[in-house]
Amino acid sequence: MPKYYEDKEDDGRACSGLREDFKACLLQHDCVVKEGKKPSECLKEGHCRSMQVAFFECKRSMLDTRSRFRGRKGE
């Protein structure tokens, strides 16, 4: 289960839960922790790709006029 469902305060920004999970995935990945690389370098290598896509889809759904009726994806 995603961590943003656990008792956390909502910061009021769109897709904030996915943003937190994406950030946590990058910062806890072996690429950053053990190898000492920057998170941006790990993204280029393809780590946490599913979280990146989910966050992108959530942000993109904010621009979709149909989502006003359906709600944002990922929330």
UniProtKB/Swiss-Prot annotation:
PANTHER family: CYTOCHROME C OXIDASE ASSEMBLY FACTOR 5. Disulfide bonds join 31-58, 42-48. Pfam families: Pet191_N. Transmembrane segments: none annotated. The keyword Repeat does not apply. Residues 28-66 form the CHCH domain. A motif (Cx10C motif) lies at residues 31-42. It comes from Danio rerio. InterPro entries: Cyt_c_oxidase_assmbl_Pet191. Belongs to the PET191 family. Keywords: Disulfide bond. One of its GO terms (cellular component) is mitochondrion. It comes from the Eukaryota. Involved in an early step of the mitochondrial complex IV assembly process. GO terms for biological process: mitochondrial cytochrome c oxidase assembly. PROSITE patterns: CHCH. This is Cytochrome c oxidase assembly factor 5. A motif (Cx9C motif) lies at residues 48-58.
